[in-house]
Amino acid sequence: MAIPVAYARDGDCVLFHGSTASRLFRLCAAGAPVCLTVTLLDGLVLARSAFESSMNYRSAMVLGHCSVLHGSMKLAALERISDHLMPGRWPEIRHPSVQELRATAVLELPLDECSVKISDGGPDDPEEDIPIPVWAGVLPLSEAWGSPLPAADLAAEFSTVPDYIRGWRR
């Protein structure tokens, strides 16, 4: 089973969180083997044939067993995950309540068994395909933040977007 989760690296571990009601997170917390993957698509490689067409990407896979974090380590991990997603926002936002902390499982997966794969290049058409009259090359893809959209109920005194949000780039 695969589900998208928020995560952050912390030294030689990856931290991620989910609902304590989730069957998957309960299994991970109980010591079931885990496979965590992250893939970033960088572009489409458009060759002169469907067979030779592919993608440029960066991917990582981590295998192992998770540890469950509690107390101050759990809160520190949630801050780390928050800062990975939204740099600089943790000092401004309301921190998790006791009830929210009870409903959230925070897991730590050591980076002991990892695999990284990168595909970066153009089409590798065989000689006999070069004369085919079709465009070939790479269509790059990049991730970019859009313009911030304020909440409908945002008070007027908070209508100016903070500098740290305007400066977010990936």
Where does each model-flagged region fall?
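General beta-strand recognition
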Residues: 13-15, 35, 108, 117
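An N-terminal domain-cap segment
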Residues: 1-16, 26
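Short, structured beta-strand-loop surface elements
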Residues: 21-80
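Short, surface-exposed beta-strand-loop junctions and turns on beta-sheet-rich folds
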Residues: 8, 22-24, 122-125
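A structural signal for short, well-ordered beta-strand segments
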Residues: 7, 64-66, 107-111
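C-terminal edge-of-domain segments
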Residues: 73-170
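Residue-level signal for tight coil/turn positions that link beta-strands
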Residues: 11, 57, 111-113
